């Protein structure tokens, strides 16, 4: 046992190749390194290429500044996702995910084998994104402690975890899914089908659930049940029921919010604009921040209605519009003359440092797609949300924001949106009685987030317990291996 304890634990971390997953992985890596772990952080070549193109000064190693500022042992490497850099992963979504499903694991396997021959200390633990289907296979082969990192709310994990119940009760994967309230999932008091993740809202009559996305879902949420530990980017006090239901099944630790307000690690896939000068001198809480995240697409018709609605509202705004927000092959999507009409009242940028902008006192609300990182950051900064979910977990996240925590409002109940809806709801969010109620509620949720990460808070306590348990499991595995090696001579 003493020999095992003398070896520094070495964790390999592999986020899913999407910016919203990379960000919490980066911050967890830094935190684990500060607790004495050696970290090897693995990005895909494609993700690294986008980051290095956007941040020319950090083109080689995104953790170089973090290492020099904190003396952390974080090593950085990249691996192919099976496609050339110029392959359009956005336009060829299904083909890309076929590669992630079938090819990517072989590259990870080769990397671990190479590192085990070369690195000191050897890799002893894998922290992989829950959406990977091969984590258990890799960990079994290389005798690694298996940790699954869930970057979304516990409610979403809990629903995916119990897909078998949704199927057997006819709410998912049925020819004509039931439309009544779902009240039989452990830890979920009641949820309507419209609040399920978008992948679970479809029936077999509408969609082929044998496609690659569904094969990934079915395999990933079977594989997570084999993990030694699951860590979640959420807070125990915000989702006690879902977390308790999951914790009854296996070791699950709520360690969120996993982000940093002053990160030195570049994670953006696009060059960032500095909005500080534009915000300077604007009245407190007068600016609406609008962003629909790093992944989801919005139709050109919807972009046009949102643009006109923002102008009609009379509210000042910063609108983050990725170049591929409509599609990588649709460069022009704003209505003619929009930027001129907005004049000094509106700023349009392709990307920015979100935390830097929304923490500015001039910003008073967030018009969002309901990505989980954006929700956590918005609450941290005390901003109410105008919710326009687009896909996957965002519909379920909206339920938490609007129905459970009462810190946001819906943009619309149907998929079709109008400029009048946008204008009216922007004004509701930013001013008046509804706005005041939302801000009071946000402050309560914000206290839960900030209390959780204090030295005696639930997330910090859970993190320290997780670290201790991982160390113990690594030591046990190393001792078992050493025991097997020396047993013939006994």
Curated annotation (Swiss-Prot):
Keywords: Glycosyltransferase, Transferase. Its EC number is 2.4.1.-. This is UDP-glycosyltransferase 86A1. UDP-alpha-D-glucose binds at residues 294, 352-354, 369-377, 391-394. GO terms for molecular function: UDP-glucosyltransferase activity. Gene3D superfamilies: Glycogen Phosphorylase B. Belongs to the UDP-glycosyltransferase family.
């Amino acid at each position: 046992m003493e020999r095992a304890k003398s070896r520094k634990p070495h964790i390999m971390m592999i986020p899913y190749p999407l910016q919203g997953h990379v960000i919490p992985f980066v911050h967890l890596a830094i935190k684990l390194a500060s607790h004495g772990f050696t970290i090897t952080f693995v990005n895909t070549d494609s993700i690294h290429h986008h980051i290095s193109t956007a941040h020319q000064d950090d083109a080689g190693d995104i953790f170089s500044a973090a290492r020099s500022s904190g003396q952390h042992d974080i090593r950085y490497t990249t691996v192919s996702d099976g496609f050339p850099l110029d392959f359009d992963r956005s336009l060829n979504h299904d083909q890309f995910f076929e590669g992630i499903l079938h090819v990517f694991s072989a590259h990870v396997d080769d990397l671990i084998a190479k590192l085990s021959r070369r690195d000191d200390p050897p890799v002893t633990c894998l922290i992989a994104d829950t959406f990977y289907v091969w984590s258990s296979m890799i960990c079994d082969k290389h005798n690694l402690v298996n940790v699954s990192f869930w970057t979304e709310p516990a409610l979403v994990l809990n629903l995916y975890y119990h897909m078998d119940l949704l199927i057997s009760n006819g709410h998912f994967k049925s020819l004509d899914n039931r439309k009544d309230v779902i009240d039989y999932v452990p830890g979920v008091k009641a949820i309507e089908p419209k609040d399920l993740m978008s992948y679970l809202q479809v029936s077999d009559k509408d969609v082929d659930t044998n496609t690659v996305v569904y094969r990934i879902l079915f395999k990933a949420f079977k594989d997570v049940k084999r993990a030694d530990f699951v860590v979640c980017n959420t807070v125990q006090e915000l989702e006690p029921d879902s977390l308790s239901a999951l914790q009854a099944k296996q070791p699950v630790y709520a360690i969120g919010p996993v982000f940093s307000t002053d990160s030195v690690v570049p994670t953006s896939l696009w060059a960032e604009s500095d909005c500080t000068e534009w915000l300077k001198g604007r009245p407190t809480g007068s600016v609406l921040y609008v962003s629909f995240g790093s992944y989801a697409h919005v139709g050109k018709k919807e972009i046009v209605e949102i643009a006109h609605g923002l102008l009609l509202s009379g509210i000042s705004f910063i609108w983050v519009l990725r170049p591929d927000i409509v599609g990588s092959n649709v460069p022009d999507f704003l209505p003619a003359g929009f930027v001129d009409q907005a004049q000094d009242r509106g700023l349009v940028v392709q990307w920015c440092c979100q935390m830097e902008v929304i923490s500015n006192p001039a910003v008073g609300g967030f018009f969002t797609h309901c990505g989980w990182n954006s929700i956590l950051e918005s609450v941290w900064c005390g901003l109410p949300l105008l919710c326009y979910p687009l896909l996957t977990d965002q519909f379920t996240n909206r339920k938490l924001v609007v129905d459970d925590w009462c810190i946001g409002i819906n943009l619309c109940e149907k998929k079709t949106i109008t400029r009048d809806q946008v204008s009216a709801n922007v004004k509701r969010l930013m001013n008046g009685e509804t706005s005041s109620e939302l801000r009071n509620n946000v402050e309560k949720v914000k206290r839960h987030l900030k209390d959780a990460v204090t030295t005696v808070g639930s997330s910090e306590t859970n993190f320290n317990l997780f670290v201790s348990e991982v160390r113990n499991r690594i030591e046990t595995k190393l001792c078992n291996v050493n025991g097997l090696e020396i047993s013939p001579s006994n």
